[in-house]
């Protein structure tokens, strides 16, 4: 297994919220875009909450910018067999502290799933809000459940 390297942060200089995932999925890495797996509910959830389309990459980036949302992953790199968070090993974290220092307008950190939250606590001892994973692997939650949960912390 080779080491997987994630994406750069998406930041706009005036963001109020940072959403942290764990590590991009295989499909996301192939498409070079966060949450590119069509079964992941991340973009449909944000589209519903902010009433904005997310059909194209440009629309997704516009939604983040207009709603002052930064996006990144806890892991800069890791070893992972398959796409599940449970398979993440040998993590090297991104420099979340530096990102927050360079973007002091960020007031809230939201973790997309337990793995992200656990790694945030492990590496940074930062306060974050742990929300349910938007991954389709989280079958216990419907899209509507996820929308309600995230709406409560985003708005």
Predicted ranges, named:
Residues 147-155:
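A polyampholytic, Gly/Pro-enriched intrinsically disordered region
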């Amino acid at each position: 297994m080779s080491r997987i390297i994630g994406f750069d942060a998406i930041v706009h200089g005036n963001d109020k919220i940072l959403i942290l995932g764990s590590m991009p999925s295989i499909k996301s890495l192939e498409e070079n875009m966060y949450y590119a797996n069509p079964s992941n509910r991340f973009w449909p959830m944000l589209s519903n909450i902010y009433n904005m389309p997310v059909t194209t990459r440009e629309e997704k980036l516009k939604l983040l910018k207009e709603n002052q949302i930064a996006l990144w992953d806890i892991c800069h790199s890791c070893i992972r067999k398959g796409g599940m968070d449970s398979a993440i090993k040998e993590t090297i974290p991104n420099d979340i502290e530096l990102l927050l220092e360079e973007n002091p307008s960020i007031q809230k950190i939201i973790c997309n799933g337990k793995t992200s939250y656990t790694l945030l606590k492990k590496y940074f001892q930062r306060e974050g809000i742990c929300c349910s994973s938007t991954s389709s692997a989280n079958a216990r939650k419907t899209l509507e459940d996820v929308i309600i949960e995230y709406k409560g912390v985003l708005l």
